[in-house]
Amino acid sequence: GSMQASLFDKDALVSTQNLPLGVLRLRELIAHEKLTQQGAQNLIAELIDNELVTYRKMYLKDREVKNLIAIGEPILTLYYKMDEGRRSEQITIQDFNRFYEHLKGMTLAQTEDFFDVNEEYASLLFPAAAMYKRMLEITGAEVIWVPGIHMTDGMAAEYAEDKKLIRFHHSFENDIIVTSRNMAKRYKCHMPHIQNVEEAALKVFDSLKKYHGLGQRERLLLQI
């Protein structure tokens, strides 16, 4: 299992990092080491710190992160119990920490009963909660937003856009371009030269469009 961390700044995608820290992997490590809850918490913190240290230095050092948007089944399960009766999509760090302390004191059997899930799924919930807790601490975020969407929602939205059934106001192509430029800065590329080459290449592409017959996707690939 793995986790993807994406950083947005004012609607623009800054970077995306895939981290080998999914809850399945964390659960296996905890079970293999036969750790206590406190030991498991320390191990998870160490693993997340190890994976995020470079990412944090490069992308978070000059940024103030206020919101963490969490997507996935484990956070939804935790959220439904934390949000009972409130009908809010956000969880404050104070509420999350209180709930985490409550969860940390539960046995596996108590976790099963509390969330009304089977043993296999119940064993994922503490590692998931510990992972989100550490992410809050590392980023300094004050609120977790839980929109309640799944991967299938994204697939359905992509299909609907391809079939012209819906139209997004957000530009995903611009996300790709911004991320590419941030990567170029990361590797100390000469930005004025890159911008001049990009501008010239796109002008040639656009002026010869009736001859080459290529579309918007090919133009995006050239721009990248």
Go through each PLM region and give its residues.
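Active-site-adjacent helix-turn-beta-strand microarchitecture at beta-sheet edges
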Residues: 1-2
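Helical "lid/coupling" subdomains associated with nucleotide-phosphate turnover
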Residues: 7-9, 15-224
